Amino acid sequence: MVLKSLSDLRNIVAGGPRKKLILATAQDQHSLGAVVRAWKDGIIEPILIGDKESIQNICNENNYEISGVRIIHEPDIEMAVEMSVKLINNKEGDVLMKGKVGTSTLLKCVLNKEWGLRTGNLLSHFALFEVDTYPKVIAVTDVAMNIAPNLKDKIAIINNSVNCLRRLGYNMPKVAVLGAVEMVNENMEATLHAALLSKMNQRDQIKNCIIDGPLAFDNAVSLESARHKGIRSEVAGDTDLLLMPDIEVGNVLYKSLVFFAKAKVASVILGAMVPIVLTSRSDSEQAKYDSILLSAAASK
């Protein structure tokens, strides 16, 4: 199975048990709108933590009906985030979502050594894009968490992403390790990492996927381009997951797809005790809703 559009996420989670989603500092309009919609659709059972009066005012102004939804009043932002994380640490939630709070504040609590959501795995960002010019949904990692991942980090990032894709129904996801060129160049670290990751996959050191690289972006997403360059690959032109060389390339690609290609996107942080919806402030309510669906599908 592969996803043809982000709407397929709804089919994956529909009819299953509701996931308990905790919205940290819930006094944010777009986040509340997405959460209420997912609740009405039977996907989640939300707990809203934050300033109760602000939450209710936003809901009243936007006609969000939340009667029956649990609200925990905590006006202090840092305390609200801490309470949210502790609830999940105590097995009272399946998904954590960022509301009106800075990313650094949320991650500080997530990574707390005493009551945070550490598992020993690397945290990584995973995004799904629906682009009109590509025949299926394509995943991209890591565009927001790991600045300059080394080889060990990239192995962990691939494993996080492949595990998520398999929960979405993929059997053997095809992973393209991106570089500026498709030839190994000793002066370009990304190509060296790509070659090593490909060989490790061939030797079954990285499992449950097919990895090829280095591949330039055009080879990864266009079979015609790959054939023109004489590249023989199971991955080229049929990529399910693009592994970025670093955060700068990843972040530029992410925003280029959204703003230039008008791509639809859903994203999640993987590697913690539960999936974390950590969308950008510029993301639309629809993107937040799709990210909730993705996180619900990724939740164990």
Model-predicted regions and their roles:
Residues 1-48, 52-235, 240-244, 249-300:
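Anion-binding alpha/beta catalytic cores of soluble intermediary-metabolism enzymes, centered on
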